[in-house]
Amino acid sequence: MKHLLSIADLSRDEIISLLDEADRFKEVLEGREVKKLPTLRGRTIFTLFYENSTRTRSSFETAGKWMSADVINISASSSSVKKGESLKDTGLTLSAIGADAIIMRHPSSGAAQQLAGYVAPGGVGPSVINAGDGSHQHPTQALLDALTLRQRLGGIEGRKIVIVGDILHSRVVRSNVDLLSTLGAEVILVAPPTLLPYGVENWPVRTSYDMDAEIRDADAVMMLRVQQERMQGGFFPSHREYATLYGMSKAREASLKDSAIIMHPGPMLRGMEINFGVADAPRTAVLQQVSNGVHVRMAVLFALVAGSDATI
């Protein structure tokens, strides 16, 4: 595996291998006062973010540093991108400096694929990891969600996973649909008609407008943020009406079966798609998702950068 651009690029065995590797990293680091491994010593990793990020960026940086890599952060707002430099020239510059991997977030779908073509023609050059490209893909988020589901539910195959919210603009849901269906889960997407994408009937999912009917027997409910920054308005009448129909209220949380968990990729809009108290409930796995993100990203960096003869 040279790059990680999309969940669709991974086989079922590769997905399971990455999840197993993430579990191994968690086990090795657990209880250590100094969380440091020599695995990527001497390697140089760049994070290149054209959009804001808290969890993904800091998680990748932590993963690299815990593996002793040199991690260099670049924000588009403070780089030559502000002067009009193209994605191609930015990527080639980082490659010339000596990047072993470039982790990129970009507002345009397909940008990660473009960057990989620029910096590693013929497979020679730095690895590219897609940290989110437009509404297209966010593969490491889907991997950390799968790891969380596996840990909390004991497995994914045959489980009913309900994803609620802004399906239209979500790269997270597209990656999760690919991954969860590959691992044998039943995936149901719940949203108002205006927030379901064209062609969703061809996805390996079932769709519904009725949140209450779908969540009662769900094993996990994943809430999505309404991405207002990608909207011009008119997708739903008001925030209050949206929260009433598609928010995880205390009453809805109480209607879930005892073993069900609630997830959210973040950032959460408390009071809109999830109630303030529910966000902190014991069955809510948000912080476990964040913690798992570091171990999943360690596993991805290990697979792409460490080399075939490397050991943890």
Swiss-Prot record:
Its EC number is 2.1.3.2. GO terms for molecular function: amino acid binding; aspartate carbamoyltransferase activity. This is Aspartate carbamoyltransferase catalytic subunit. L-aspartate binds at residues 83, 171, 225. It catalyses: carbamoyl phosphate + L-aspartate = N-carbamoyl-L-aspartate + phosphate + H(+). Heterododecamer (2C3:3R2) of six catalytic PyrB chains organized as two trimers (C3), and six regulatory PyrI chains organized as three dimers (R2). Keywords: Pyrimidine biosynthesis, Transferase. Pathway: Pyrimidine metabolism; UMP biosynthesis via de novo pathway; (S)-dihydroorotate from bicarbonate: step 2/3. HAMAP family: Asp_carb_tr. It comes from Corynebacterium efficiens (strain DSM 44549 / YS-314 / AJ 12310 / JCM 11189 / NBRC 100395). InterPro entries: Asp/Orn_carbamoyltranf_P-bd (IPR006132), Asp/Orn_carbamoylTrfase (IPR006130), Asp/Orn_carbamoylTrfase_sf (IPR036901), Asp_carbamoyltransf (IPR002082), Asp_carbamoyltransf_Asp/Orn-bd (IPR006131). Gene3D superfamilies: Aspartate/ornithine carbamoyltransferase.
